[in-house]
């Protein structure tokens, strides 16, 4: 798609937004219902596209993309009317004889730039929030998941007037052309370097941005943890989508006292999940493309492999791999892995573990396995990270009742449920003041008799 076509799409959406058609709550609900029905109608197409692009099994496709997206859409449908209403606020003395309220209004013409690793979930969830809030939306899916992008385009073409939602497929040229346009809001999910680039381009028009990025999310296991449960849940979170998950446990920090037992249990759980030959398992996915395959494979140090380590270039598959005895300066600790490699480091004290995490860029997620409530509270309260779990992994992502997002190097802003609606809304504060009484002492000239009243009213 060329720059002229993209400019026309944006202009058409802006003209449509100015008709105020999207301000009607019933219209928003109808749009969400259309989205829900279209996703349901294309469940088989979505599953097939995910199998093509990423090798995802049907069950994983439903659990992590289709079902979760439908749940979020249903949540927006259920709450859009209440969230869209004006909400009364208390009035202070200075605004006596007034009605004080907040009113959420849509930003306008918005851009959602989606990633390839969960191409439906990470497009449909922000889309639902944007529609509930009353915006028009241009979606730019990743070129790395072409089958999924094609299905997304088909879903949106069937469900929406293009003046409300349009999908723009393509690669870098289309990204550049889109970022040349003036937007009222940009929502980006992807890598830190590209997120910085998007924010830089958005700053030229002072466009507000939400950045959902990533980072090296730590998983801490102390000596009190239920190791069998920890092993199962760590294996689930790490090997899901063959590690291509922004909130996957990136590395393991384990107390030296339980190191050997925990690694043995993770090996057992991994074999139970995928068998002795995971590269031949049809339910075990593949790396998205040859470029990423080469990058991930290059992070494997053969001398430190204690599980897996084998890669098959013809199918872009890499075994679930555990690296033990990893040092902080190793290559695998210098970047977000985004693949099925779990580096293991040890600690002697909780102070050491906390300092290790705090000395690095703020991660998107953190996981702490411990039966000690004081330890749980310590890491949750005092260690900086976006969100996380106690005695589990990644499940904080799977709810519409709490927001999800990063901080620092892992992003800014939140979405899911009410947070999605708020992310795509501007909240106006309104004072509606009566005219039958006008307090005189707020007006100049400020004579001496007014001083006492001014102090009373504004203190």
Q: What are the residue ranges of the model-derived segments?
A:
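Structural signal for hydrophobic packing residues in well-ordered secondary-structure cores
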Residues: 17, 21, 36-39, 43, ...
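Conserved C-terminal structural/oligomerization subdomain of aldehyde/semialdehyde dehydrogenase
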Residues: 220, 271, 317-459
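Residue-level signal for inorganic ion chemistry
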Residues: 28, 73, 134, 165, ...
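Residues at or immediately preceding the N-termini of alpha-helices
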Residues: 6, 25, 43, 227, ...
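Rossmann-like NAD(P) dinucleotide-binding subdomain of oxidoreductase/dehydrogenase enzymes
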Residues: 91-229, 347
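ALDH superfamily catalytic-core signature
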Residues: 160, 193-327, 350, 390, ...
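N-terminal Rossmann-like NAD(P)+-binding subdomain of aldehyde/semialdehyde dehydrogenases
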Residues: 1-101
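Aromatic/hydrophobic pocket-lining residues that form π-stacking "cages" and hydrophobic walls in ligand
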Residues: 126, 152, 198, 266, ...
């Amino acid at each position: 798609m060329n720059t002229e076509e993209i400019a026309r799409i944006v202009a058409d959406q802006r003209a449509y937004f100015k008709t105020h058609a999207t301000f009607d709550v019933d219209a928003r609900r109808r749009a969400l219902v259309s989205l829900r029905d279209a996703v349901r109608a294309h469940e088989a197409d979505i599953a097939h596209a995910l199998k093509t692009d990423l090798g995802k099994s049907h069950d994983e496709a439903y659990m992590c993309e289709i079902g979760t997206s439908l749940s979020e859409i249903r949540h927006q449908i259920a709450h859009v009317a209440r969230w869209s209403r004006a909400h009364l606020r208390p009035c202070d003395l200075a605004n006596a004889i007034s009605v004080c309220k907040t009113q959420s209004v849509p930003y306008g013409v918005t851009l959602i730039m989606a990633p390839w690793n969960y191409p439906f979930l990470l497009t449909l969830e922000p889309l639902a929030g944007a529609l509930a809030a009353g915006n028009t939306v241009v979606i730019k899916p990743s070129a790395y998941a072409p089958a999924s992008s094609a299905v997304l385009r088909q879903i949106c073409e069937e469900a929406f007037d293009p003046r409300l939602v349009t999908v723009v497929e393509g690669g870098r040229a289309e990204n550049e052309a889109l970022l040349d346009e003036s937007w009222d809001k940009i929502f980006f999910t992807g890598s830190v370097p590209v997120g910085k680039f998007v924010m830089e381009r958005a700053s030229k028009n002072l466009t507000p941005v939400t950045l959902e990025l990533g980072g090296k999310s730590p998983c801490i296991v102390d000596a009190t943890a239920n190791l069998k449960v920890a092993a199962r849940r760590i294996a689930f979170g790490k090997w899901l989508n063959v590690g291509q998950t922004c909130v996957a446990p990136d590395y393991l920090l384990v107390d030296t006292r339980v190191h050997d037992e925990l690694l043995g249990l993770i090996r057992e759980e991994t074999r139970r999940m995928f068998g002795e030959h995971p590269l031949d398992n049809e339910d075990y996915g593949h790396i998205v493309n040859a470029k990423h395959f080469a990058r991930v494979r290059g992070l494997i140090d053969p001398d430190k492999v204690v599980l897996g380590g084998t890669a098959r270039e013809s199918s872009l598959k890499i075994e679930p791999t555990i690296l033990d005895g990893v040092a902080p300066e190793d290559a695998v600790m210098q970047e977000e892995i985004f693949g099925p490699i779990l580096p293991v480091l040890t600690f002697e004290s909780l102070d050491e573990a906390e300092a290790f995490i705090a000395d690095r860029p703020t991660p998107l997620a953190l996981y702490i396995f411990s039966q000690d409530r004081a330890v749980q509270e310590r890491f949750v309260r005092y260690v900086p990270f976006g969100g996380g779990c106690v005695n589990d992994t990644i499940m904080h992502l799977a709810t519409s009742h709490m927001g999800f997002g990063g901080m620092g190097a892992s992003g800014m802003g939140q979405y899911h449920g009410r947070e999605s609606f708020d992310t795509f809304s501007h909240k106006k504060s309104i004072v509606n003041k009566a005219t039958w009484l006008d307090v005189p002492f707020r007006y100049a000239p400020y004579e001496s008799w007014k001083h006492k009243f001014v102090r009373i009213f504004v203190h």
